[in-house]
Amino acid sequence: MDPRLLSAYNEELTYLRETAREFGEEHEDVAGRLGLKTPTDPDPYVERLLEGVAFLGARVKLKLQDQFPDFTQHLLNAIQPHYLAPTPSMCIVGFEPQEGDPAVIEGYKVPRLTELEAIAADQDGATVTFRTGHDVTLWPLKIVEAEYLGSRAAVAPYAAVANVRAEAGLRLRFAATGGASLSQLDPPSLPIYLAGSEAIPGELYRQIAGETLAVIARSADSASGAEGWIKLPAPEQHGFEQDCALLPTELRSFRGYRLLSEYFACPERFLFIRLMELGRAFAASPEACDVVLLFSRSTPVLPGAVFPSNFRLFAAPAINLFEKQLGRVPLNRYDHEHLVMPDRMRPLDFEVYRILEVTAFSESNTHPRPVAPLYAFGALLYDWREALFYVPRLRHRRLSTKEQRLRRRTDYLGTETWISLTAPGEATRLDDVHELAVRALVTNRELPELLRFSGDDGLPA
């Protein structure tokens, strides 16, 4: 029983007794017949009546209080649908081009939203699905050397070529792999993920994105002087674009909130920069090419701490959020809400992030009818005499009896999604609806926590 019920009952009973006393003072004749005139020695029948009314009033009061979160939930779902949604797991994934594959010579594109699957440890083969957030183009290319030039003297020869006053610099040496020639490659832009631990990636990002004065490049085996250098455009930040979003975007939502949500969930997803027009430098570099970035200031953290492993090619952020056709939702006319279960065989392996589409079916499974969200923009465009609408509601998942007795796999509980139908024009139209087909964005709940990462080059999750 709700522990708040006793407090609400006492409040209601006190209120009834006080108002009864005031009523008895103003209307003595009526109060005398009701037994309210002497509250210190009340009529036992009237007292039982007051206690019963107080009990019913307390239950109604608690019900109204419990409805307020539902009201705010429906309101937020209409104006800011991502506020209440669970936060999916995010990580950085890396791709490796297959050496000798002729397809990568021209650049093999791995499109955004490509699904990647992994197996959760000790979970009977449960699959965890991630989707990439960036386009990744694979080239037979690698960074073989990385050197941070931390003094004005070290960058003086390069600064003279670029005609800038630089205090520090970064030299990256690119080489082709798989027997390919560097001059065969023509990447219009090359995204690089700044990997590493502690402050190294952040300092590199700050210098490359905010303190670059010039970018120059030439063949690593070039014996020419200043004539062999090529000036390249400044590097660009990568990952803030709308077409690089991990979380679903909404026109009615503030774009900055999406960026903040992604940053606090996985700050590494923004540690991407792009080098531009490297094909011009590669054209004159059959074996290897040196690219030098010149900075306006030096930082004491980076000298001696920068290695090729800090610059990951062919990486992209990924999110455990994907579309899924859920199992049919059977309707019971005696229940006003129905549980949306993504997979009845593995109910705890999925969590609904957002409902995308609902279709109603009759008992004969014919004449499917679309069901629109009630509290959403555009709902008024439907004919309310014919249309069906649904209202989703999130609830915190409760522990099952088995979970209460045995150990849970993690501390995360997550949420459950319930759905209710309404027909504003005529409620009897719901009698023909036998079940619902639901398509939604889902996550794998806490299964990403159970993934095992092996190797020395594991990327953050």
Pin down the residues of each PLM region.
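Extended assembly-interface regions of large multimeric machines
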Residues: 1-222, 229-232
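Glutamate identity and glutamate-enriched acidic tracts
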Residues: 11-12, 18, 22-28, 47, ...
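Histidine (H) residue identity feature
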Residues: 27, 74, 82, 134, ...
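Surface-exposed flexible segments
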Residues: 93, 106-109, 114, 300-322, ...
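Short, flexible beta-strand-to-coil junctions
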Residues: 98-100, 121-122, 197, 295-300, ...
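Short, surface-exposed linear segments at secondary-structure transitions and domain or protein termini
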Residues: 138-142, 239-244, 460
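Short, low-complexity Pro/Thr/Gly
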Residues: 147-148, 173, 179-398
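C-terminal domain/tail detector
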Residues: 362-461
